[in-house]
A protein has these predicted regions:
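Conserved beta-hairpin
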Residues: 71-100
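C-terminal "cap" of GNAT-fold acetyltransferases
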Residues: 171-210
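Conserved active-site alpha-helix within GNAT-family acetyltransferase domains
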Residues: 142, 146, 152-180
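Conserved acetyl-CoA-binding loop-helix of GNAT-fold acetyltransferases
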Residues: 125-138, 150
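Active-site rim helix/loop that mediates acceptor-substrate recognition in acyltransferases
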Residues: 48-82
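A short beta-loop-alpha structural element at the N-terminal edge
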Residues: 30-44
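A short, internal acetyl-CoA/4′-phosphopantetheine-binding micro-motif in the GNAT/acyltransferase core
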Residues: 117-124, 153
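Conserved beta-strand in the GNAT
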Residues: 74, 95-106, 111-118
């Protein structure tokens, strides 16, 4: 196992469950997973930027992150902890900084999508990405969801967490008709609609059954 998480549950002023997890990486790093806040948006955008430039993740405007911020969790590196800049004996960051993120977007009463999973380049291979994904899956279970979808180039990574490739549209016609009312590109990718295929070439459509 690449990381260990110890969770405590609290409540944000909005009533949204505030899950906090301490994550220990294979490099000895310690980071905190927590719900994202509006103040994290620019850090999230900066994490995603190099992935979007390589077309691994979809580029988004800042306003999109603000609109969806309640779907995100972030991994925060705490001053004095090992991690990027500190795990190899170098200086730890002077202030907390965001070194990972991921989002869970609900698409139907039994279905959600993992979106925008990204980690700082220095944190790749430490188990942080897996820890974020496991936390998003845990949130899906808590909400009573039965399936989690992802659109990804990283098929081996998601496959290691139980996701399997899918073909076609794994919903009935009534649900399909309702989903067509949405303008969301992620939902269109789940439905395998032609309008998003130019932007998803090479991606695998994968599904996890909970």
């Amino acid at each position: 196992m690449n990381s260990t998480a110890v969770r405590t549950d609290e409540h944000l002023p909005t009533g949204r469950a505030a899950r906090r997890a301490e994550v220990y990486g294979v490099d000895g790093s310690r980071r905190i997973l927590r719900p994202a806040r509006p103040a994290d948006v620019r850090a999230i955008a900066e994490l995603v930027r190099p992935y979007a430039e390589r077309r691994v993740l979809i580029a988004k405007d800042l306003i999109s992150y603000f609109e969806d911020i309640q779907e995100f969790i972030v991994a925060e590196e705490i001053p004095g902890d090992a991690g990027p800049g500190g795990a190899d004996g170098g200086e730890a960051p002077a202030e907390p900084r965001i070194v990972g993120c991921g989002a869970l977007h609900v698409m139907w009463d039994d279905l959600a999508e993992v979106r925008t999973l990204a980690v700082h380049p220095d944190a790749v291979g430490t188990g942080l990405g897996s820890a974020i994904l496991r936390e998003l899956i845990a949130q899906a279970r808590e909400m009573g969801l039965k399936r989690v979808f992802c659109l990804t180039f990283e098929e081996p990574f998601f496959g290691a967490h139980g996701f399997v490739p899918i073909e076609g549209t794994p919903v009935g016609m009534d649900v399909f008709a309702e989903m067509l009312r949405s303008h969301d590109d992620g939902l269109a990718a789940f439905l395998d609609l032609a309008r998003v295929k130019p932007n998803t070439l090479g991606n695998a459509r994968m599904l996890l059954h909970l």
